[in-house]
Design a protein with these regions (language model features):
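Short, small-residue-biased leader/transition segments that mark boundaries at the very start
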Residues: 2-7
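N-terminal glycine-rich phosphate/adenylate-binding segment common to multiple enzyme folds
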Residues: 15-16, 22-90
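Beta-sheet entry/capping signal
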Residues: 1, 40-44, 85-87, 155-156, ...
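Glycine-rich phosphate/diphosphate-binding loops that line cofactor/substrate pockets in enzymes
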Residues: 36-39, 144-155, 219-223
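N-terminal beta-loop-helix "entrance" segment that forms/cooperates
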Residues: 8-25, 194-208
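A short, acidic, amphipathic alpha-helical segment used as a generic capping/interface helix at domain edges
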Residues: 28-34, 208-223
Length: 224
């Protein structure tokens, strides 16, 4: 894969500030270096502290610290970005709602890039519609798999890790290994809408994907 090639070639490795960072964070350095090597002169890498609040009762809805601020890390560690011929933009924006996202993008892109406010709002709304459509498709597929399991007396496993574990570059083929034994594999976001979490929880579900994990686990415990 492209990500694997970036990693194997060790692109951007000199700008990674800590070995303890997650694999996607390390890849980000390589991708930025790859873009610069291709002569790209404009890079937009926003920081996204808040995710959509998928559960009203959730304690919070942050993204993880990497997603929240990694654009800043890149800016401060990739020396090539100091070149005046490179435009690098990393505003902080929130995905809490399409209106909040659009308002923040209008303030930033309207001022910095002179993009029409109406065009920005339309794009943000369309993006949110597509995001919801994709989420719905994932949930419908989860329900389809659950029905298949019930109809055929099959078992399934919920692979409930971090969001990026869905990437074949990272998960080492574990989903395919499981399905080769005729066991269904579900992601946490394919069934989280079916769960009901007993609240208050012992831990604050600070990040949105934690809320999905708790909801998915709550559903799993109701199944035979």
């Amino acid at each position: 894969s492209a990500a694997s090639e970036v990693y194997k070639r060790q692109l951007g490795i000199e700008s990674i500030p800590s070995e303890s960072e997650c694999y996607p964070a390390k890849l980000a350095h390589g991708h930025i270096s790859w873009l610069l090597n291709q002569g790209v002169s404009y890079i937009f890498y926003p920081c996204v502290p808040y995710e959509r609040k998928e559960f009203d009762e959730a304690g919070n809805h942050y993204n993880c610290p990497i997603v929240t601020s990694y654009g800043e890390n890149i800016k401060n560690n990739v020396e090539e970005l100091a070149d005046e011929s490179i435009t690098y933009q990393n505003p902080f924006v929130s995905f809490e709602s399409d209106k909040i996202l659009a308002d923040e993008l209008v303030r930033y892109l309207g001022k910095e890039n002179n993009i029409d406010a109406g065009e920005i709002r339309k794009a943000a709304h369309k993006a949110y519609e597509e995001l919801q459509k994709t989420r719905n498709d994932i949930r419908l597929e989860g329900e389809r798999v659950l029905k298949w399991m019930a109809d055929n007396n099959k078992r399934g496993i919920v692979l409930a890790g971090r969001p990026y574990h869905i990437d074949p570059e990272i998960n080492h083929g574990i989903p395919e290994l499981i399905t080769s034994y005729d066991i269904a594999v579900l992601s946490e976001d394919s069934i989280s809408h079916l769960g009901k979490v007993d609240r208050p929880t012992i831990a604050m579900d600070q990040w949105m994907y934690h809320s999905r994990l708790y909801a998915a686990a709550s559903f799993v415990r109701t199944q035979n």
